[in-house]
């Protein structure tokens, strides 16, 4: 009798495990897997890590990008301790400055990043310090706006920029650190060319899909497609195309702008993107209600079967 019951149990188990999965269920499982490949983060100031890490942990975030004013051994120690305590992991250190940055089309080319000659020496020093700080804390990458990279590869500013970035890339590579370009000032194909020409193997992209729109360099989806080979992280931000020839397009809350987030997420699922999406809203730095709402919106897009 026991043997008969056992055989019946085995037969039912075989039947259950061989029930075909419907197309809808397959799509649901596929979307859950896609969402599982994504980590969500926010941008925080790293000068007071105990408080900042606790706040974003309470909001349900496990990752962040850091902005730090001074790179000191004491702060590095506090950051390491906070990472362990709160299990919040910095994905990049945003390393900018020193000097003025003009976020427009008139003064921007002469003030942003390493393309302008005037600020190079001090900013290279700052990047070296940022890379060393990443190594000390355990942050895998440093990232920055590197400037309005010239379209013409024969332009002397382009040639100088490539030489500088090769040195920075090698400096970071020797310390096990990656360097991320923030999209914005250059066309996607120019950025792709620059990374190829630099060629140190540790250069990647933090793709700010709104910047592609706000600088008028590309629509968000096409820009992402061109750069996807090197995209390790994404800034979830929205904006409008520029209409004033001297000023960037306006930033707006997601999904009120010209970034096509349903198409962006569909493409990320298509290419099986694995990486971080950092929610950024520069109009309200600590608008946690907006950040949580946006995270839910993006998660819903990942789980959508449409």
Predicted regions and their residues:
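Hydrophobic faces of well-ordered beta-strands that scaffold small-molecule active sites
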Residues: 38-44, 64-66, 90-95, 142-144, ...
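N-terminal pre-domain/capping segments
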Residues: 22-129, 135, 173, 200, ...
């Amino acid at each position: 009798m026991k043997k008969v019951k056992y055989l019946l149990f085995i037969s039912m188990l075989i039947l259950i495990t061989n029930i075909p999965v419907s197309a809808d269920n397959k799509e649901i499982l596929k979307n859950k897997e896609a969402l599982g490949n994504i980590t969500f983060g926010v941008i925080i100031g790293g000068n007071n890590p105990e408080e900042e890490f606790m706040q974003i942990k309470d909001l349900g975030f496990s990752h962040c990008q850091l902005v730090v004013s001074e790179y000191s051994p004491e702060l590095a120690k506090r950051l390491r301790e906070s990472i362990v305590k709160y299990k919040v992991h910095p994905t990049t250190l945003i390393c900018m400055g020193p000097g003025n940055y003009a976020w427009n089309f008139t003064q921007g080319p002469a003030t942003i990043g390493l393309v302008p000659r005037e600020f190079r020496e001090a900013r290279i020093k700052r990047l070296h310090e940022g890379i060393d700080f990443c190594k000390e804390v355990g942050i895998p990458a440093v990232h920055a706006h590197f400037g309005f990279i010239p379209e013409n590869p024969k332009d002397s500013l382009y040639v100088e920029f490539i030489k500088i970035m090769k040195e920075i890339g090698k400096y970071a590579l020797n310390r096990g650190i990656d360097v991320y370009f923030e999209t914005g000032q250059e066309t996607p194909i120019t950025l792709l060319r620059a990374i190829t020409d630099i060629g140190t193997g540790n250069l990647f992209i933090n793709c700010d899909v709104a910047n592609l729109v706000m600088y008028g360099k590309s629509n968000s989806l096409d820009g992402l497609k061109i750069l996807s080979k090197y995209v390790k992280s994404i800034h979830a931000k929205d904006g409008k195309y520029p209409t004033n020839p001297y000023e960037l397009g306006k930033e707006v809350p997601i999904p009120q702008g010209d970034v096509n987030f349903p198409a962006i997420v569909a493409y990320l699922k298509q290419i099986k993107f694995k990486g971080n999406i950092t929610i950024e809203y520069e109009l309200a730095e600590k608008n946690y209600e907006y950040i949580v709402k946006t995270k839910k919106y993006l998660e819903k897009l990942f789980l959508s079967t449409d």
